[in-house]
Amino acid sequence: MAKLTKRMRVIREKVDVTKEYEINEAVALLQELATAKFVESVDVAVNLGIDARKSDQNVRGATVLPHGTGRDIRVAVFTQGANAEAAKEAGADIVGMEDLAEQVKKGEMNFDVVVASPDAMRVVGQLGTILGPRGLMPNPKVGTVTPNVAEAVKNAKAGQVRYRNDKNGIIHTTIGKANFSAEQIKENLEALLVALKKAKPSSAKGTFLKKVSISTTMGAGVAVDQASLNTQA
């Protein structure tokens, strides 16, 4: 049997895997155990009451977290004309059309989010095999294909997170950093859960938010008692 690291031993001693923790208690526990030499991200896993095999029950979307994610997001925008100027004014890091596509083809992708105006999709569509596997392909469902590219840029910069359930019906995303206050993490988590509830497929039956767990980059998951959260839409 593999030898447990000191950190894993401490986590096993401190975290009761059978318990759902009140949110402030859960955050305090995560912060106590976040001992890496870098500021760890706070991630969330939400088990949804859906049948992920059915396309009409898949959940996908985006929402802006009130306190952002703690990351500096670089945004590339495929657009032209007046939209290009608007994107730059909104804070886009890279703006272009065919020239930007050539950069992508060369592997020059120094950005975290790609936004495109509808008229630019003829260019972006050729990049699907490059952008798709990296989760960068613009999509109208998450607001990254839009005539209002300036708003999309501002949302991305403000800490918008995109979510999509995996094959097991679980949503994984980031809701902040371990150096956020408990209140900031709580409010970010609540904002995400409200967005998920609004995105509940009409065909999904029973309890929708089945389990909510938060963790840090190098830590174990801590289950959160949903009664300690305000998720009224």
Curated annotation (Swiss-Prot):
PANTHER family for the chain: 54S RIBOSOMAL PROTEIN L1, MITOCHONDRIAL (PTHR36427), LARGE RIBOSOMAL SUBUNIT PROTEIN UL1M (PTHR36427:SF3)
Assembly behavior: Part of the 50S ribosomal subunit.
Species: Vibrio parahaemolyticus serotype O3:K6 (strain RIMD 2210633)
Annotated NCBIfam families: rplA_bact
Keywords (A to Z) from UniProt: Repressor, Ribonucleoprotein, Ribosomal protein, RNA-binding, rRNA-binding, Translation regulation, tRNA-binding
Protein name per Swiss-Prot or TrEMBL: Large ribosomal subunit protein uL1
Alphabetized Gene3D superfamilies for the sequence: 3.30.190.20, 3.40.50.790
One GO CC term, this protein: cytosolic large ribosomal subunit
The family this protein is said to belong to: Belongs to the universal ribosomal protein uL1 family.
High-level lineage: Bacteria, Pseudomonadati, Pseudomonadota, Gammaproteobacteria, Vibrionales
GO molecular function: rRNA binding; structural constituent of ribosome; tRNA binding
